[in-house]
Amino acid sequence: MKQILDFIPLIIFFALYKMYDIYTATGALIIATAIQLVVTYALYKKVEKMQLITFIMVTVFGGMTIFLHDDNFIKWKVTIVYCVFAAGLIIAHILGKPVIKGMLGKEVTLPDDKWAKINHAWVLFFTVCAIANLYVAFEMPLDVWVNFKVFGLLGLTFLYTLFTGMYVYKHMPKEKKEEQE
């Protein structure tokens, strides 16, 4: 259920962009993301930091997009969010508080060096996505960027999550693998 909630604002953004324009879609994205936060809190009594950061960025950059009638701001939002996530993972790693281990460590047991590799891999992933977004956003037509944002980055994230899961499974202790099967 929670994963479905995460995609609703993006689906609304895409649909309204195709029906109207980037400004209508951006306004709807802001509203849908706010509703998503409220619903998430109502259902789970908690809002994750990533959701909160995304909401703040959507509101700030989306607001500037609408207010200044300049779609460059919403394009920059994607890159900045990815950079914030990458920086957050780096800082957490330096401080000895690995975020990904914190998210998955309750269900999955891995050696610390494997958690560090996963962390570094996600830093690299977020950095590559940020750079790719910059290229597509500012070198391609708006339609291409919207499709890339909705389908390209989402697809890449899904694949990377799948590869991460495969890596985790490969390095799980044998007794944990047997429990999973």
From Swiss-Prot:
It is found in: Cell inner membrane. It holds the Pfam family IspA. The keyword Transmembrane helix applies. Coiled coil: none annotated. The chain crosses the membrane at residues 22-42, 50-70, 80-100, 122-142, 148-168. It is a multi-pass membrane protein. It comes from the Bacteria. InterPro entries: YciB. Keywords: Cell inner membrane, Cell membrane, Membrane, Transmembrane, Transmembrane helix. GO terms for cellular component: plasma membrane. Plays a role in cell envelope biogenesis, maintenance of cell envelope integrity and membrane homeostasis. Belongs to the YciB family. This is Inner membrane-spanning protein YciB. It comes from Aliivibrio fischeri (strain MJ11). The gene is yciB.
